[in-house]
Design a protein with these regions (language model features):
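Core SAM-dependent methyltransferase catalytic element
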Residues: 74-77, 94-115
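A short glycine-rich, Lys/Arg-flanked "PGG" loop and its adjoining helix->strand segment in the class I
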Residues: 1-12
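C-terminal and late-domain segments of enzyme folds
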Residues: 83-84, 104
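Positions that flank functional sites
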Residues: 21-22, 85-87
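Short alpha-helix
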Residues: 58-81
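Short, glycine/charged-enriched secondary-structure capping and boundary segments
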Residues: 1, 28-31, 95-96
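Conserved class I S-adenosyl-L-methionine
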Residues: 12-43
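Class I S-adenosyl-L-methionine
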Residues: 48-55, 86-100
Length: 115
């Protein structure tokens, strides 16, 4: 609600995040649960440059649908979604990925909502 009050009338709210339901979200939640990236469950699946483990442990993870529901409940409307990191995490450093519309496949998602 504080963010909505801070926006001018017809303002735009932008959220960029790793969705809980994405491959990256699952990987980071597992690393948080086991306390390290250096765990047999994560061998061979980690990207070369993961987020710092401290960020994974400190993060509060939510699904994109949860975020949309909260924004709608706050009165936001006219949503746009963009995503990237569509490859499995261990392959993300091989090529630059373009941003594409949507949110169901990306490991990093932008939600754009209007007041």
């Amino acid at each position: 609600d504080v963010c909505k009050k801070a926006l001018k009338p017809n303002g735009t709210f932008i959220s960029l995040d790793v969705p809980k339901e994405s491959a990256f979200g699952f990987m980071y939640l597992l690393a948080k649960e086991v306390g390290t990236f250096d765990h047999p469950f994560l061998n061979g699946v980690m990207p070369k440059l993961p987020y710092p483990h401290e960020l994974c442990c400190a993060g509060v993870w939510h699904s994109t649908e949860e975020k949309i529901d909260v924004l709608k409940a706050l009165g936001f409307h006219d949503f746009d979604f963009y995503q990237t990191l569509l490859k499995n995490p261990m392959y993300t450093n091989e090529d630059v990925e373009d941003v594409v519309p949507g949110y169901q496949s990306g490991g990093y998602v932008a939600i754009i909502a209007h007041k």
